[in-house]
Amino acid sequence: MTDLVQQLAKELAVRPNQVEAAIKLIDEGASVPFIARYRKEVTQGLDDTQLRQLDTRLAYLRDLFERREKVIESLKEQNKLSDDLLVRVNAAETKNALEEIYAPYRPKRTSKSFKAKEAGLGPIAEKIFAEAIDPVEALAGFSHEDYPDLESQLDAIQHILIDDWAQNIALTTELKATFAKTAVLKSLVASDEKKEVGKKFRDYFDFSESLNKVPSHRLLAMLRGRQENVLGLKVDGEDEAPLARIETEYNLDAVQPQARQDYLKQTAKLFWLGKVRPTIEHSLLTEKRLAAEAEAMQVFAENLRHLLLSAPAGARTTLGVDPGIRTGVKLAVVNESGDVLAHSTIYPFAPKDDKAGSLTELARLCREFNVDLIAIGNGTASRETEALVAEMMAANSDLKLTRVSVSEAGASVYSASELASQELPELDVSIRGAVSIARRLQDPLAELVKIDPKSIGVGQYQHDVNQTGLAKTLEAVVEDCVNSVGVDVNTASAAILGYIAGLNKSIAQQIVDFRKENGRFDNRQALKKVPRLGERTFEQAAGFLRIQNGSEPLDASAVHPESYALVSKIVEAKATTVKDIIGNTEIIRQVNAEEFVDDQFGLPTIQDVLSELEKPGRDPRPEFRTAKFRDDITEVSQLSEGMQLEGVVTNVTNFGAFVDVGVHQDGLVHISELANEFVSDPHKVVKPGQIVQVRVLTVDVERNRVNLSMRPEGAAAAKAPRQPRRDQNEQRTERKPQGKRPQQARPQGDRPQGKKPQAAKPQDNKIGGLGALLLQAGIKGSK
């Protein structure tokens, strides 16, 4: 445990006792959100980011340490464990590095070397290596049926020597470092026939770059090309220096007689070209791939975090619009709680072309149900549908409607899911998509947790990375986001409750079932009546579960029940009541936190409690804002260089950001065009859902590519790491048809419960998040 603690402390730049405390809590079953918020004294202030890193690395290092012990045991059994080898085994920082060290010693009963030694050639190989003797003379008198001639015997001895030399870990480690300095990654098109079907990879049909300098997104693009049998990849490098180093290691230039020297130098060449170099090539590419995957997963995680925590429009009656052409445009009205009030299908486009009837139906639904927001899915026919809605709004200006473009990525996945069938059993599968779109605008977090994060469309090469690792990473992000906001236990769906600290899908469903059978929970203590929700689970979850208008005012806040006694002391000291102190800034700021420190409550907890009392149930998400698309620009062909546009960031990568400007094809703002100053990390400048002003740099209608800039016109381009824009072929987000979208009344409100967002007035128009998700299309006179 000591080595493990020391390593984690070093990696996280914290004290060992902090790591020990966190490990103890994790091993006892505490979740990261719970530890981060309610056990600050125990960990001495480790935050959620540090705890996530610790949790991830703890699992990895435990696996590594366990494997290390098995390797050491195996080496001992083989009598191969020298002091130097033990040092190297203990110094291996990754599983791959450990396996590389162990590989030459792994028992192999089918190797050519093992077979040759079994035939009695081992002593002869040692003699040739150590003594000044002609190899042919050394073999005089040897006879074995598996090696009937001199050539086969000499080959077999080379296999023995090569395997023995491979156990010189100091040498092979040095050879790897030497080769890595000149290593180049090369890609070539697999065949002429692949040029057409794999044209999206054409920038890599004849490409090479220093392996050390290949950025992660470019490597993943090439690996995808290889996976699709379009590209062939090869790690190339110089052989002279490694060969010279091998000859120096074994002093081969001084070997006598000449026949022995020639033989051993040939063996050295075979050792390098046939044994060591292929292993090193594979190792270097694997290391680079794993690093690229980790980086891609981090990009996905950050994008997902921003998306989930994007601004909710709040409790406002919303019309969800799921565009379509032949199958019609699906409509669904949901109330402030997300319950379905009405649904319909209109056919404004070919082949029916019922524009007049469609306008009438849109206006009827908006007027009859007093609709406030119109959420329009951004897939096929979205701009045509937006134009239709805009026409209806112009003809019914008294309705004071606001229309917003919402990402429908993953809507079809949700619509066809078992969860959608449970929530909307009476609705056709195609209508469910419209319901989901409306709810996404009201509360993105509550709705998006129902969808596999990989279907949301904010990942960078998400299908090319380790899927198990990706799933764990994204699940942690969702868990952190849900717990940072909190949920109303009396309205939340099982889908979002399942991410609350201490809960799982099964217990979440038990809570929902109990609520249906027994009515709303009046206080947090009532949760203990739920089957399988014991004391330990209650301790973990209670602080993140809110109860509005219950018998205990503190239940609507993030104050944990274990701190209610502390609040009572504060209230008593200030001669007031719990109800009166909540939200009373004047009283709270008069409290001296240090006066209440005791063995049970430390200063961090007291300060957190006071902050929560001042603004109970605060929602960490940004304010709802809107942006505008130009109504006269709906296709790439309508763009021109120099055009100034407003758009929304849909995806952030390591080489720039993609922005939806309303033309069915996201434009790329290269990293060098994000700002006037140097930008090392695009995530520090923009995030998914951010509304930005862009300028069109270039338009390629044939290739459907748009390059944008966020720098003021005339400003000198900021220097950026050299990252050719070839990578955008694989990254551009095109608005594609969603396929047949599954076509109802959802359980009472799934929305998370930070303080419930206030319905924004139409004229405030504040959207901001949901990635491309939330955009107001600007309509004159639309307030």
Report residues per predicted region:
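Short flexible coil/turn linkers enriched for glycine and charged/polar residues
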Residues: 15-16, 28-29, 95, 121, ...
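Short, ordered loop/turn segments at secondary-structure junctions
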Residues: 38-40, 129, 238, 323, ...
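Phosphate- and other anionic-substrate recognition elements at nucleic-acid/protein interfaces
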Residues: 42-43, 49, 296-308, 314-317, ...
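Extended, highly charged clamp/arch subdomains and adjacent linkers
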Residues: 49-317, 336, 359-364, 368
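Long, highly charged, low-complexity intrinsically disordered interaction regions
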Residues: 56, 63-81, 87-90, 422-520, ...
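Structured, non-catalytic alpha/beta "coupling" segments that mediate domain-domain communication
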Residues: 74, 88, 99-102, 225-238, ...
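A glycine-rich phosphate-binding loop feature that marks nucleotide/adenosyl-phosphate handling sites
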Residues: 177-184, 321-325, 380-381, 406-413, ...
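Single-stranded RNA-binding regions, centering on S1/OB-family and related RNA-binding modules
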Residues: 547-783
